Amino acid sequence: DKAFLYVGEGNVLAACNALVHEQDRRLKVPESEREMPVLFNEYCTTWGCPSEENIRAILQAIRSFGIGYFVIDCGWYKPDDKGWGNATGDWQQSATLFPHGIKAVADAIRAEGMVPGIWFEFEVAGRDSQAFSREELLLKRDGALITSKNRRFFDLRKPEVDAYISERMIDFLTENGFGYIKIDYNDTYGIGCDGAESLGEGGRQVADESLAWLDKLKAALPDIVIENCSSGGSRIEPKRMGMVSMCSFSDAHECAEIPFVAANVSRVIPARQSQIWAVLREKDTPSRTVYSLCAAMMGRICLS
């Protein structure tokens, strides 16, 4: 890997523009990304409870919009008696939410001319998952499991973790016909972990394995579109951004400050990679609707 430096006269914005231009020049994306299609993500419609029923209704409503990607966000795996946030890690589709299987929904999305996408947070196990108690798969520090309130972290360096994630994520994507993955990451294991000469080196190794999974995804599914999320824009850095198609710019869904956030993000990633929420509500005034759509035009439009 190489570090890129910029030296020149001018201000910080000029330096940022030069570095972003270099990132854009080096970017390699799937063929489906050439025309930078508009997305629809159902999160701000279902708020973590997607289902076959509500997705089919959404597909009917957006049929005429010319959307390229339809992303099923978090919650598709949640148990009947638990919330989505602490159920990450097992990655078993809900038979209640998807009685005909999630592949039937992915097929319905493709039948409407869109690439089906789905949300994963594959590096963590939530408290309500079985994986949360599988000590042999999880990171430790000073011999104790690293627990961040309701989450633990897979030790991505272990072959058995590699096999587990391959089965639960890559096989799932392949078998169900998904062409897009939204990778989220909403926590941190802190200063590092056991298993190396220092805690920091352990943490670095795990971070490297996280990046290696992007290559594994592309090797298994060469046309896969990868969205880098992480609580919105918490993993916006050149190495990772050079390995993905785009990035959720922020978890700012509906606030009036979206253009300011988007403008600042444009200093560090190319506009073609900056996915900006445009959440439209029936109660919105015409001026609010125009504002939401125009704000998203500072990058990639993600409707909800």
What residue spans do the PLM features occupy?
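N-terminal carbohydrate-binding accessory modules
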Residues: 10-31
